[in-house]
């Protein structure tokens, strides 16, 4: 909840652990230090700040600081003196300089999205607790080799920078599971060729009638719409995603659109009907099949506390049959994507739609905002990327197993799932299976082989 400076000055916030101030501040309010004994989370986003006070470490319990959408041109060095600070968020400033002195010793999560950073300090390699690093929309031309020591790094966003290559050591980080790098010079040509070379229907804007807004994310807004048909046919319900065009924490909307198009058809992906043509404001958009409202997200996104792991509804449980179908469906979809030269980059339960009611057991992988492209024929590179994403899949499988009913009564299946999870999460990257290996293990367990046989027999 946003509070006011007047409330702070009146002493109404004594004892608070979380403070949010967005009052057009150009200077750090000294009254914040009255909360030094309790304040843990400080959010100063959406102000006009360019500096922080030298005595910021007086906030001795401060764990998290947000200062996005301000006027900082450098990451304040005083942050490095805050002994308990683990999360630092300075998105959408004008930051060019990041000093090694600005990195706190317990840094776990650093957000520098949409700034002007050209160089990261070598001291980042000493951030032994670093798990999540958000750098999309900067001017980085290289990464410091010292980052190879960041053995706990799990999620890395590098999209929309100036990188000419991914360093070899990056794909050797033992816990890296979620990577996005689209919109860099070394990958731009692949994304551009998708938009030119991949066949997709063009749908005139005037053939669409927007109805209710279904949702909004960082990259765009999704609407329910009616797609006009020929005069002798009724219009059909569809979903339309109109992209915003600005850089997001994951990357560029144009790259997301290209990935959706390149993904093609698969039973566990949301079908794309076509690309919007002749929008009056020139906006880019996709027309997709409308998903049955019985589908819901499998989980919520990570919290400030969980950092890289999704948050499930309390008490949420899955039957064994559902777990097997989800696990197989997502492995099959990921295998298909990598064959198409697409790495999803955000393979998480919160990006998976799970059916209920008549759709029970059905599963769809969505949200391509962090997707990146690779040449599938470059086996060494593409296999390395795939094994990286297999670790993300292992995290998903671990979460499903933890919430699965019926394992005690199916000891053999339980043993196979636990062993598969362990292989996917192995820090010996070369020993991890590829997605087709995973699908081969799960296909007979999930009954997918029987369904495939039945489908072929019906043809």
Where do the PLM segments sit?
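Conserved short submotifs of the Hanks-type protein kinase catalytic core
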Residues: 281-295
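Catalytic-loop of the protein kinase fold
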Residues: 334, 338-356
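ATP-binding glycine-rich loop module of kinase domains
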Residues: 220-258
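C-lobe/activation-segment region of protein kinase-like
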Residues: 364, 368-419
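The feature captures the LRR N-terminal capping module
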Residues: 1-54, 58, 63-77, 81-111, ...
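Short beta-strand micro-motifs within the conserved protein kinase catalytic domain, predominantly
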Residues: 271-284
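Structural motif at the C-terminus of the N-lobe alphaC helix and the adjacent alphaC-beta4 loop
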Residues: 258-269
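Activation segment signature within eukaryotic-like protein kinase domains
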Residues: 326-327
């Amino acid at each position: 909840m946003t509070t006011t400076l007047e409330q702070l000055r009146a002493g109404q916030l004594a004892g608070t652990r979380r403070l949010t101030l967005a009052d057009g501040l150009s200077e750090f309010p000294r009254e914040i230090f009255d909360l030094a004994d309790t304040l843990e989370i400080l959010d100063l986003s959406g102000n006009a700040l360019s500096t922080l006070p030298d005595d910021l470490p007086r906030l001795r319990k401060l764990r998290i600081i947000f200062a996005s959408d301000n006027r900082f041109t450098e990451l304040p060095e005083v942050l490095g003196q805050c002994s308990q600070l683990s999360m630092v968020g300075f998105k959408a400033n004008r930051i060019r300089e990041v000093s090694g002195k600005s990195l706190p010793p317990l840094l776990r999560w650093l957000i520098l999205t949409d700034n002007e950073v050209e160089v990261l300090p070598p001291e980042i390699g000493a951030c032994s607790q670093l798990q999540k690093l958000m750098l999309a929309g900067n001017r980085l031309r290289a990464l410091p080799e010292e980052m190879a020591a960041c053995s706990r790094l799990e999620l890395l966003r590098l999209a929309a920078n100036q990188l000419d290559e991914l360093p070899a050591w990056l794909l050797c980080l033992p816990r890296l599971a979620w990577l996005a790098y689209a919109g860099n010079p070394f990958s731009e040509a692949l994304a551009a060729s998708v938009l030119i070379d991949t066949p997709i229907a063009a749908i005139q804007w005037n053939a669409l009638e927007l109805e209710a807004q279904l949702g909004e994310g960082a990259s765009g807004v999704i609407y329910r719409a009616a797609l006009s048909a020929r005069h002798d046919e009724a219009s059909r319900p569809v979903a339309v995603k109109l992209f915003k065009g600005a850089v997001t924490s994951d990357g560029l909307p144009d790259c997301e659109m290209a990935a959706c198009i390149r993904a093609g058809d698969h039973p566990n992906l949301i079908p794309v009907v076509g690309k919007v043509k002749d929008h009056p404001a020139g906006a880019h958009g996709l027309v997709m099949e409308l998903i049955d409202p019985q589908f819901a997200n499998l989980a919520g996104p990570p919290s400030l506390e969980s950092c890289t792991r999704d948050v499930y509804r309390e008490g949420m449980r899955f039957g064994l049959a559902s777990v097997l179908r989800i696990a197989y469906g997502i492995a099959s979809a990921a295998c298909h994507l990598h064959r198409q030269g697409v790495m999803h980059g955000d393979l998480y339960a919160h990006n998976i739609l799970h059916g209920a009611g008549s759709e029970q057991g059905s599963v769809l992988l969505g949200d391509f905002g962090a997707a990146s492209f690779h040449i599938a024929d470059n086996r060494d590179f593409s296999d390395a990327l795939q094994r990286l994403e297999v670790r993300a899949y292992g995290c998903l499988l671990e979460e499903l197993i933890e919430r699965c009913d019926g394992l005690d009564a199916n000891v053999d299946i339980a043993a196979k799932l636990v062993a598969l999870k362990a292989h996917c999460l192995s820090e010996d990257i070369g020993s991890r299976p590829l997605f087709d290996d995973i699908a081969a293990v799960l296909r007979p367990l999930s009954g997918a082989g029987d369904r495939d046989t039945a489908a072929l027999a019906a043809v």
